Amino acid sequence: MAPATEADNNFDTHEWKSEFASTRSGRNSPNIFAKVRRKLLLTPPVRNARSPRLTEEELDALTGDLPYATNYTYAYSKIYDPSLPDHWEVPNLGGTTSGSLSEQEHWSAASLSRQLLYILRFPVYLVLHVITYILEAFYHVIKITSFTIWDYLLYLVKLAKTRYYAYQDHRRRTALIRNRQEPFSTKAARSIRRFFEILVYVVLTPYRMLTRSNNGVEQYQYRSIKDQLENERASRMTTRSQTLERSRKFDGLSKSPARRAAPAFVKTSTITRITAKVFSSSPFGEGTSENITPTVVTTRTVKQRSVTPRFRQTRATREAITRALDTPELEIDTPLSTYGLRSRGLSHLNTPEPTFDIGHAAATSTPLFPQETYNYQYEEATGNKIKTAFTWLGYLILFPFFAARHVWYTFYDYGKSAYMKLTNYQQAPMETIHVRDINEPAPSSSDVHDAVGVSWRIRIADFLSSFVATIVEAHQVVFAMFKGGIVETVSYFGGLFAGLTDKKSSKFSWCQILGLLLALLFAIFLLGFLTSDNTAIRVKEITKDKNASKKSEGSLPAVPIWISAANHVKHYTWMVKEFVVDIAFDTYNYGKSTIGRLGTTPRYAWDLIASGCGAVGNGLKSVLSSSFRFIDFCAGKLFYYGSDGFLSANKSIGTFFNGCYETLYNGCTAIVGHTKSFIYNASNAVYNFFSTIFAGLLNFSTSSQNSILSLLKSFGTGITNIFYNFIYAPIAGVFNFAGDNYMYFFNEVAAVFGKVYNSVVSVLKTVINWILFLIAYPFSLCTRAWIRISQYAPEDVVQVIPIPQAITPTPDVERIVEEPLRKVTDVEDEELVIIPAPAPKPIPVPAPTPAPVIIHQTNVVETVDKDAIIKEVTEKLRAELSAQFQQELSAKFEQNYNTIIEQLKMENTNIQYDKNHLEAIIRQMIYEYDTDKTGKVDYALESSGGAVVSTRCSETYKSYTRLEKFWDIPIYYFHYSPRVVIQRNSKSLFPGECWCFKESRGYIAVELSHFIDVSSISYEHIGSEVAPEGNRSSAPKGVLVWAYKQIDDLNSRVLIGDYTYDLDGPPLQFFLAKHKPDFPVKFVELEVTSNYGAPFTCLYRLRVHGKVVQV
């Protein structure tokens, strides 16, 4: 091979950079058939053929002198640059030398569908297992309870039947004796005794049933699925062991039948298993002169091999261990000699007994050696009924604890298993064990004999038997090979499509399918090649040729000699072909692993092989050229002194050989070149073919997933529509109907209760009046009697008191001095203070005391009080003067007030606002905004007593945008009711918090909180600043406001006014009452007649203002 140049060692100038990287790193870059070797969710995915094309900047960044080394790059790939040579990817050296390139992993495009499927199905499987375990735990309790109750009922029925039959028998027996009657005391005692006896039986029956068989709750002990699988596996292994024991005979060993028992745990002497492989490399089988070295087998038990942790030992598992005879943790049969009963006095004899290993196949038994270990004996177990009863009681009390324990271990088991799958945890391999093949012949008895003490007859028999065994073994190997191939193929298919829990199948990818297709194509090609010449046809043709070539005596052959020779050549050619096929077949069997690796060789590796062949051809060329030159030189020297004829002949021969060499070299070079081109084109064609298949499968998978998703989406939409139309809509309609008409029902109920209340009050009033009359009537009688008695009292003379005269003069009104009105200069205080004038006081005039005047001469003397008369006259005069004064003062005040207001309006234009004044104005505006933006009472507000009583024929507009959910489960669509129009949810209005009705005409009737005299109505809509895109076309335009005595009395309604809401005005607009009704208003209706163009109309906030009227 030609030496490598300096350019080949330079990465930048190397022609095939992938070859350079793989040569320097020791690792080949993978191709599209490489398996995924990265851990799920731990490393980022790599770029693949469907990744977006890299830009020039990215290419420069990936292939330039980076300060760090990247793990992979697709910069030098034919996917992005078809002019580059055929290679896949190149690791970036990051500006370092090639010597620092360490061995690293490369990842090819991988499908994560398998891992995604496992992640999606794992929570479902986990939940199903947990539910199954909980149901199984409850099932055990229910099963115990149901069977116990059923047995208890059957026992009661049986007890009743027994008692009834005894009673009938007793009655029949006593009826035979005439005139014999038992005393009453005997009958009563018997009845009492039977009653208590039945009562005791009924109470103690459950206890007797539970303790009858002396079985505790261990018979219902919960076992996981893994325990069940272990038991099934142990059972299968035991069956194999027993079958092998019955089918094999061992000379000199005990043939006692196996026996099953429940022995006690005793320490004694027993044996250790020793196995040996009986396969021999000798073509004549195992010779007697060769010594077999036994191999001591130490295997882990099923419980120790398990990846996931086992449940804690219970009494049932300990009893199972106690019952084991051959393996302490498995329940299998053992011959009688291992019992303590037979080995009690014979332990020194070391009698070997056959025992079999529990593995994937049965092991061959060889002479055994004693070892100190555990053995078992029979022992009858006695139970304790009281302990059993307490065990049951504790189990029933602590059942939640047991259930929680099962649930915990279930989560722990499957959680650890999932963690191992996600992290690609590889468990430790099992210990090696020498096992015997299923078709392997059993060892003969001569294997254990000494070669010196065997006669020559036995040796010949052994030789013949071993020779026959070798032939049989050869056939068995061939058939086992075919069987193994079939089993591996089936296992491979099963791992691809059914091995959902196998760790190897968790790395499933489309690359395996492509590899499988390649293997199938190769198998079809091989099958066609092997079956090209049918054996029967070939034999028939050979027989025909032989018959045709026969000739009779004294006659010429029927077939010419050259045809017969051609047939023989054909026959021997076929034999050579069959020999070559056999060689290839054997090569495949013994080089299966090498061929398997070649099956996944990258495409560029074949180029490397071709280039290697070219390099070998170059070397061969140089070697042959040197050899011929050496021969030519030697021949020239040898025959130099020969004759010219010999020299010329030598030259001719040299020229001939040189020409042959040149011809051969040129032919080989052409063959190598054509072979290389053919392999390259064939690999490209195969690659393109499988790439097309892969793309088709990928597109089919994507379209299938999309179809399934669309089907599920359609199914979900249909379910949602069914739920809405048939479940939610009727329920919502009922609730809406109830919400819209609850006031009607409430009024009816209130009227009924009002009538009942009035009736009760009237009855109570009548009763109370009667009670008061009955109480007051005796007192009235006593009072009348007392008055009648007082008429007969003596008469007394009453002295007349003289009335003094008083003169009240007229008050001097002119003396009241009117103070000039002050000029108001303070703008913020516009109220005028009215100073009331003092009322005139009367001036008392002393008068002499006149003599009493006798008015009427009767039994009672009456007098006139002058002070009372003066006081009455004074009060009348004062009232008249006050009214006149108030009238004149009001006229004066109104005149001065108008004058001051005009002056203030003129002065306001020149007012300068200072800081305090502005602060006062701002506070006034904040106060007005805080009082519902109006500073007036809203009698339609729901929180103060207002209510929406009707919407007439208005149909609510539903947007189906507010979906209510419960635990992320959609329940129903929420929409605002008409009540939101008179509610104050916040100080500001937000888009959507309104009641919308269809089209542009609608009604809303409101019951006010009080009877009022309506002065104005205000309506507020959202501003254009908060509306989306400033669109407020759903605002009302023309409105009518009506007043009702009763909401259903259309004849009494009065139009307060018709108004237009100006969309260009402020959001809150006031409308003064144009017509005031002549009755106190309790019901107000807003009728919208038009809007600003939307297919629906929205109402945000309605207010009604006025003054309360006492009714």
Swiss-Prot record:
Q: Where is the stretch described as Disordered?
A: 232-253
Domain SUN: start-end pairs:
945-1109
**Could you give one GO CC term from the UniProt record?**
cytoskeleton
Annotated region (Required for nuclear envelope localization) at 118-244, 503-507
**Which Gene Ontology molecular function entries are recorded, alphabetically?**
lamin binding; protein-membrane adaptor activity
A biological process (GO) of this protein is: egg-laying behavior
Nuclear topological segments: 1-509
- Specify one Pfam family: Sad1_UNC
Region: Interaction with zyg-12; residue ranges are 912-1111
Q: What is this protein called?
A: Nuclear migration and anchoring protein unc-84
- State the organism named in the record: Caenorhabditis elegans
Which gene produces this protein?
Answer: unc-84
